[in-house]
Amino acid sequence: LGDVYKRQVGGRVGSDGIHGATFSSLELTEESPSSAVQIGDPITQKKMLDMILEARDEGLIQVITDNGAGGLSSSVGEMAELTGGAKLDLGQVPLKQAGLSSWEILVSESQERMTVGVRPDDCEKFEALASLHEVEATAVGEFTDSGAFVVHHGQTPVAHLPIHFLFDGCPQLNLDSEWSPPTHLPVETPELDEEGMGKLLARLLARPNVASKEWWVRSYDHEVIAQSVIKPFCGTNHDAPGDAAVIAPIQGGTQGLVISNGIAPRYSDIDSYAMAAASVDEALRNAVCVGVDLDLIAGLDNFCWPDPIESSKTPDGRYKLAQLVRANRALDDVCRAYRLPCISGKDSMKNDAMMGGEKISVPPTLLFSLLGNHKDVRKAVSSDFKKPGDAIFIVGETHQELGASELAFMLRDEGSGGIGGDVPDIEPERNMKVYRALASSMKNGLVSSAHDCSDGGLAVALAECCFGADSGASIDISPLQSDCSGLDDWGALFGESLGRILVSVRPSEKEAFEKSMEGVCCHYLGLVSEGDAISISRDGEKVLLGSMSEMRDSWKNTLHGGGL
């Protein structure tokens, strides 16, 4: 890097975010400090990002990293490995408040800050660009080849650490993992007539994992600068759930960006491999629903895990570590099969707390986020049914997979049976063929709506699509028996098999759509209907009948912000 000066760019350092990295690696208690949580400033972030991108395009940046875990101590320390040393003067660092001690300035993780390396000849241009964007860019030190990371606060020495110690001084842990598949009581399903099944679906729609998140989402503005094409909610009343966001960042342009997520922590109770695989597939499936370009996608893996290190407080550490190993194997297997590179991610490995003398741990969880290109946002597809008379299809195979499903947990919570053992299996090659065929149909304008089947299975997905159109639906699930000879009504309606998307098509496009989906699993189920009823049959007999208005009330009144 030669003679390169360090610049802190963006927000100021404050007392927020101090020991944030430590906080995320320790057991939570009532004494855990709130100051470890960073305070966001999206306006400063936006100004800084615009300035950084312009500086990049002008060739003014030699090296850059964000001030995440450990703040300046990590960002400067990490980049110092490139040159073999660095000098840092904490007295030059802009502060939110006076009185911070040297160590607090060094480790604070206050948000919206980048550490940037700039050549001396480019410093004037860099600072002028920062001024233009109203962004602070302060010289805080320089890179050296001294072999040490040297920190001062003005004239006062703070730290002098050999570079080799920073990167090689801590030996890597050698840990043992031990996987033993857990056993659970089987799912026990009740005997219900069609109206009883309708009421059960209404209860399922009220479950927190399924219920409308509208009150939460609308607490924050998702319409800033009017770039959103597919929004969090869609349909006649703008309250039906969308699968993914589509934005058009270039005004007047037709190219867009798709952002989606997948998360399935329930499956970890049976197998964390299935959990991670389902999370990746859900994120991709959600993106497919809006018309993503499957050849331009990338992922971010965010792990949220209970303590996986065996100790007196965590006697099952070997098992939790084995869960982590299995989740990473799934991430590797599925992302390679989908040709889906992971470009970033995060982990938090100590999500445990003592409450009332009892240890509470989060379920092993992978939140998988996906970014993708949309070639033409004018052809983006939303999840809501459009018109009565439209044909309803399901693409992808349905199997008898109720293990750890939302239905299984609801029935268990109501006092009936366990969560079973048959978690959804994944066939990424088969799924990708379905996704590509559907993407081609969307490109040709054959698809009116698309919504993924995930929490609650086909029945929940069907109800959510009806919410968007203020409509009903009448379908026959008999064709699904060709996917799985042992498929019963419960598996067909509430199983959460991966790789499935519920689609509606205009009557005039039905034949063309069926032709475009030849060679992959695609079943015609029925029609969008006028009125308030959702009706599901199998082999000529009604298996579920319910009122959409009652289901909407159940769905919207769980997470409603205290009735506001």
Segment roles from a protein language model:
Residues 6-564:
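Glycine/proline-enriched, intrinsically flexible loops and inter-domain linkers
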Residues 1-5:
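Short, small-residue-biased leader/transition segments that mark boundaries at the very start
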